[in-house]
A protein has these predicted regions:
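Helical element adjacent to the flavin cofactor pocket in flavoenzyme catalytic cores
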Residues: 140-196, 204, 382-393
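Beta1/beta-strand and adjacent pyrophosphate-binding region of the FAD-binding site
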Residues: 2-15, 33
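Flavin-dependent oxidoreductases
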Residues: 18, 174-283
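Short beta-strand to alpha-helix junction loop
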Residues: 60-71, 95-104, 140-159, 166, ...
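C-terminal catalytic lobe of FAD-dependent flavoproteins
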Residues: 250, 300-399
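Helix-loop-beta segment of a Rossmann-like dinucleotide-binding subdomain
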Residues: 86-96, 108, 121, 126-161, ...
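Glycine-rich FAD pyrophosphate-binding loop
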Residues: 24-47
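Dinucleotide-binding Rossmann-like beta1-alpha1 core, especially the glycine-rich loop
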Residues: 51-126, 136, 252-254, 262, ...
Length: 399
């Protein structure tokens, strides 16, 4: 079976679906086919995160993350409101619990202001007015942070895009001929031909790029983020975060009250034994071998061994995880933490061991690859989708 289309999108996470949605809005009548190997949308990063609409306070001014998160947060709130999707603008606290964190907290204040985000500085006596159980030396309150149900957002994007979305359609082969577009053969033998290929494959994006004949110059290293549900959700009003270490693109163990009223605690960040390794027993030798064969992984491991061991300790020891939480909320007990589903973050790592700290979008002949889109990509998905669509339309216009 062979099908013809204008654009083939691989991946029905929130970025792939936002791209299909943006294409349909920017060029009505365009033919878009989305290929997704799972049986539904948003099965991996999109559907397995904290559900936070990030304000953009963390990100380097001028970066894609800063620009797209600040813009995307407001757009996501509007999108949810227009489509009746559960959401709430809750604000959040970022709490410094040690003196060594105070300079980093002040730097966040400056960064937030540079990004145009309203930030309020709080002393220790002011913290309980926002979160009665939180304790710290100082904190900042970011009023524009919110929460939503990204799985529902993805489903609405899928419906609104009018794209031909095919679930259970895993790309097996990709061929490309100069001036003649691309052809994707799925593992069931179907061939889909298009003029442009868009790679939004998330945890598999580097593999899809190589399948298309492009060198991504990075590898995805999967980091599992483990969560607990708080048995006493009344301890938390909204969102409580630690001060992150700027060396790492992870925000630390935090507490998030979701749209369902439950409070998620986490995530940590531990190396996963598979691209879709949502627990310790899940190990895929091919995935693990690919990680270990990448020189960048070993550079990264040597550089940050101490941090990595600490994360492993919090993964294997519930008591250690609880201690991390109690730095923010001393009232939390170990038996308050109930295991919840984990997520896996697709983190791009360069050959020299650099953790890619911004969104990464690259182009090849007839291809557009989204190669690094971890948090805050869900928040920023509408602007990311427009940017990818802009590049796709540029390729189509050039013929």
């Amino acid at each position: 079976m062979r099908d013809e289309t204008d654009v083939v999108v691989i991946g029905a996470g929130i970025v792939g679906l936002s791209t299909a949605y943006a294409l349909s809005r920017q060029r009505p009548g365009i033919r878009v086919t989305v290929l997704e190997k799972e049986q539904g949308p948003a099965r991996h990063q999109t559907g397995r995160n904290s559900g936070v609409i990030h304000s953009g306070v963390y990100y380097r001014p001028g970066s894609l993350k800063a620009r797209y998160a600040t813009r995307g947060a407001a757009e996501m709130v509007r999108f949810c409101a227009e489509h009746g999707i559960p959401h709430q603008v809750t604000g959040k606290l970022i709490v410094a619990t040690g003196r060594e964190e105070l300079p980093r907290l002040h730097a966040l204040v400056q960064r937030g202001r540079e990004n145009g985000i309203p930030v309020r500085e709080l002393g220790p006596s002011q913290i309980p007015a926002y979160e009665p159980e939180a304790r710290g030396l100082a904190a900042i309150h970011v009023a524009t942070t919110g929460i939503c149900d990204y799985g529902t957002v993805a489903r609405v994007l899928a419906e609104s895009s009018k794209a031909d979305i095919r679930y259970g359609a895993e790309a097996g082969l990709i061929s490309r001929r100069l001036g003649r577009g691309v052809a994707v053969r799925t593992k069931d033998g179907t061939v889909v031909r298009g003029r442009v290929l868009v790679n939004c494959a998330g945890l598999q994006c580097d593999r899809v790029a190589r399948l298309a004949g492009d060198d991504p110059k990075m590898r995805i290293v999967p980091f599992r983020g483990e969560y607990y549900e708080l048995a006493r959700p009344e301890l938390v009003r909204g969102l409580v975060y630690p001060v992150p270490d700027p060396v790492f693109p992870f925000l630390g163990v935090h507490l998030t009250r979701g749209v369902d009223g439950g409070v998620h605690v986490g995530p940590n960040a531990v190396l996963a034994g598979a691209r879709e390794g949502y627990s310790w027993p899940v190990v895929r030798p091919a995935d693990l071998a690919g990680t270990l064969a990448w020189p960048g992984f070993w550079h990264l491991a040597r550089r940050h061994a101490g941090y990595g061991l600490g994360e492993v300790g919090r993964s294997l020891s519930k008591a250690a995880f609880t201690r991390a939480v109690r730095r923010l909320l001393p009232a939390v007990r170990e038996d308050d933490l109930v295991p919840a589903p984990a997520g896996v973050r697709a983190q791009a790592v360069l050959r020299d061991g650099t953790l890619v700290d911004d969104f990464l979008i690259r182009q090849g002949p007839g291809t557009v690859h989204v190669l690094n889109a971890p948090s805050p990509a869900a928040t920023a998905s509408l602007p990311i989708g427009r940017e990818v669509a802009r590049r796709v339309l540029g390729v189509l216009e050039r013929g």
